[in-house]
Amino acid sequence: MEWLIFSLLLLAVSASGQLCPKRCMCQNLSPSLAILCAKTGLLFVPTVIDRRTVELRLTENFITAVKRRDFANMTSLLHLTLSRNTISQIMPYTFADLKRLRALHLDSNRLSVITDDHFRGLTNLRHLILANNQLHNISPHAFDDFLGTLEDLDLSYNNLVDIPWDTIGRLTNVNTLNMDHNLIEHVPLGIFSNLHKLARLDMTSNKLKKIPPDPLFLRIPVYAKSKGSPLSSLVLSFGGNPLHCNCELLWLRRLTREDDLETCASPPDLTAKYFWTIPEEEFICDPPVITRKSPKTFAMEGQPTSLKCKANGDPDPDVHWISPEGRLIANTSRTLSFSNGSLEINITSLKDTGIFTCIASNAAGESTGTVELVVSPLPHLANSTNRIREPDPGPSDILTSAKSTSSVSNETRSQERKVVLAELSANSALIRWPSQQHFPGIRMYQIQYNSSVDDTLVYRMIPSTSFDFLVRDLVSGREYDLCVLAVYDDGVTSLTATRQVGCVTFVTETEFSQCQSLRSHFLGGTMIIIIGGIIVASVLVFIIILMIRYKVYSQHGADSGKGTAMTNVRSQTNGGQAAGQVPRSSSKIVEGQEASGGSLGGAANIKDSTALVLVTDSETAVQISEISSEDIVSPTQRHHPRTCIELKRRPSLSCKEGTSSDTQEDTASPQVSDEKKAQRDWSDFKI
């Protein structure tokens, strides 16, 4: 009984010691442990994995990313297979604990970039399979930890245009190198010369037009198939490339090979022909011919100029330029030579006057052409006969580095030559220097400066009448070395010489202050816009209110005009019919007269005249309402009434009461003429 209990406990301990994920197969073949999780639908690396596992296969699942904790402390793992998943992300130092790992399979995933930290810690890796991914970039230091141990590298079926060739050239232990089915266009010369153990190189189906001869290909036999080839041979596969079959591939044509799968894509007379069936004498190159070059070129001293030289040939020739002194022109801060044959001179000097020679060369030969450059001196502002020779002309090479010219003697840094920094910001600096009156015949000043992290000099030429210069487009937070040189004529040799005025070193401000300034300007402009908007809105509201009030009063006046009675009121005295006295009226009368020829006389014109009585207040409206219909005179009997002002002239008359009939007024005939005479002095009132 005790023995049975002990056996059960032993089985339980052994079962708990071996952790096996669900739906996976775990093989415990001592002393190794293998876990196989193929086609199990995993979305991530199982967490329940024995850390003593030697072989782990997680193929054909749906894992999208791998992290460092997935393989932490698995120091015994030798073989890791993650093929045919959907891995698109590898976290840095994911495999850092796999010190003994020998084979890593990551083929058929979705990797696009390999960085420096992806394979850190794999110091014993021998097989790295990265085929069938979407790789377009591999870091130059991605394979640094296993450069001396890697034996098999597979980069096939990716999107690689360029490969870190320097890294490939240091894989001294590599045996198989597969780079087929990519977009590689160029292979550097001699890149495989140190790969002494290389047995198979596959460059099939790329965009290679030529394969440069390599010392490795000449030392050992090269074959097209691995079957039947000696152990000390190299199997080279380069079919499916658009080969340009000229003299540059003649070395490959002379190799002993059995296959005839490669064809030529160019030149036109060899297109689609089998590479190995073309005779050697047809692998020819055309020497270069210069087809176009610049004519005689004129330039002003200190100004930029450009020289052109175009050449054709097979293969495309390389163009180099030779200066009038017979020196090869290299790319500097003053001169730039381009692959298309152009030569750019940023600052011309009188010493550049002469004949420049362009040399076009390729594998078939070379061709030369000449271009004459004439540099005209700047106009003299003073009489050259009065110039004297400067005892210390200083360096005459305008390409002198700013840092080297800054280490001059203390004499040249005297107070009168000192360059000062007047203003400084994050992206600009204002420098000033005193007038150089002791320099005779100064043509211009040359400013040259560079950053502390960049040795490339920047040149600026300014007139001799200027004593300050604003340097723009600087980088914030950088240290700059700046020197001012005076360009003048040597009175004896008539050559252009330069002498240093002074140098200064400064550090530009950080971008923070500029951001604050921009922010304050931005806030100030915003406040101005807001205040202006408020003023404009207030004016618009005021105009709208005036328009509304005008419209309301206009409608009110129109309605009042429609309701106004058109009548002619005639006032009479209170019982004084014979005298023709008219009582005072409190209403305001607007009387309009129509006269012929501007005359107010005539009975007919007086009878035809009309008057408008406008009622403007409630009191007047009440008085008009009390007038009876008999008081309103017909147009044929209308007479001009007298106003209270006229009646007040007569003390015997009163204008307080004024209602009488037309018959009473007619009886006062003796006074009619007097009344008509007085009516001429009446005035109109418009309300």
From Swiss-Prot:
Residue intervals of the Fibronectin type-III domain: 415-510
Glycosylated residues (UniProt): N73, N331, N340, N346, N383, N410, N450
Designated name of the protein: Leucine-rich repeat and fibronectin type III domain-containing protein 1-like protein
Residue span, Ig-like domain: 287-376
Biased composition (Basic and acidic residues): 673-687
Ranges where the LRRNT domain occurs: 18-51
Residue segments, region Disordered: 384-412, 563-601, 630-687
Annotated keywords: Disulfide bond, Glycoprotein, Immunoglobulin domain, Leucine-rich repeat, Membrane, Repeat, Signal, Synapse, Transmembrane, Transmembrane helix
Species annotation: Danio rerio
Chain segments annotated as transmembrane: 528-548
Ranges of Polar residues composition bias in the record: 398-412, 565-576, 657-672
Family membership noted in the UniProt record: Belongs to the LRFN family.
Gene Ontology cellular component list: membrane; synapse
Topological domain ranges for the Extracellular compartment: 18-527
UniProt cross-references to InterPro entries, sorted A to Z: Cys-rich_flank_reg_C (IPR000483), FN3_dom (IPR003961), FN3_sf (IPR036116), Ig-like_dom (IPR007110), Ig-like_dom_sf (IPR036179), Ig-like_fold (IPR013783), Ig_sub (IPR003599), Ig_sub2 (IPR003598)
Role noted for this protein: May be involved in the regulation of excitatory synapses.
Lineage: superkingdom: Eukaryota
Signal sequence bounds: 1-17
CDD domains documented for this protein: FN3
Residue ranges of LRR repeats: 52-73, 76-97, 100-121, 124-145, 149-170, 173-194, 197-218
Protein location: Membrane; Synapse
Main location: membrane
Ranges where the LRRCT domain occurs: 241-287
